[in-house]
A protein has these predicted regions:
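The beta1-alpha1 cofactor-binding region of Rossmann-like NAD(H)/NADP(H)-dependent oxidoreductases
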Residues: 7-19, 51
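Substrate-binding pocket helix/loop in short-chain dehydrogenase/reductase
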Residues: 44-46, 53-58
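C-terminal helical subdomain
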Residues: 131-132, 151-197
């Protein structure tokens, strides 16, 4: 298998178009998109969040995901055989927010709507769309959890994290399914992280 590296800014339509054009030139088709770009924002009260920060999070987490899905759908509809699979990276924050996370939480709720709309609108074209909601995978984004993170009750506590390889395995299993089968939503998280009952 050949790897193709294409630097891109998912928040810019032209950059996304170039990314998918390069993909089509290199491989001739697109079978799976893992829609994974995302970022957070500083944990501050709502009234202190700069609108520029809000827009940056929305541009990456929602607009970027839309632009990548849109480009993938164009390819998947046009190719023969038609179809493919889109896996959107949601978050457990699509179900239960953390304190002071309005921008991130709002975009992850919106990703769920994006996933459902793609599933409905693209079903006639053999395009399956699912979402994986990840909680506390051990990445750079979650390193701060080892030192303690703000909880809904105002306390700060360490939270367990899981090996990100387990997430990769879950995504690979979703991607491997035949197109007549779909995991619509999957939640994967560190077993003892505060999620059920959070808040």
């Amino acid at each position: 298998m050949r790897a193709l590296v294409v630097p891109a800014d998912v928040a810019r339509e032209e950059s996304v178009r170039e990314l998918f054009d390069e993909t089509q030139r290199a491989y001739g088709r697109l079978d799976v998109l893992f829609n994974n770009a995302g970022r957070g924002a500083p944990a501050v009260p709502i009234e202190e969040l700069p609108v520029e920060t809000w827009r940056d999070v929305v541009d990456t987490n929602l607009t970027g995901m839309f632009l990548c899905a849109q480009a993938a759908i164009r390819l998947m509809k046009a190719q023969q055989p038609q179809g493919g699979r889109i896996i959107n990276n949601g978050s457990i924050s699509a179900h239960a927010p953390r304190p002071f996370s309005i921008a991130y939480t709002a975009t992850k709720h919106a990703v769920t709507g994006l996933t459902k709309s793609i599933s409905l609108d693209c079903r006639p074209y053999g395009i399956a769309c699912g979402q994986i909601d990840i909680g506390n995978a051990a990445t750079e984004m979650t390193e701060r959890m080892a030192a303690g993170i703000l909880q809904a009750d105002g306390s700060t506590r360490q939270e367990p994290r899981m090996d990100v390889a387990h997430v990769a395995h879950a995504v690979a299993e979703m991607a491997r399914l035949p197109l007549d089968t779909n995991v619509q939503f999957m939640t994967i998280m560190a077993t003892n992280m505060p999620f059920v009952g959070r808040g």
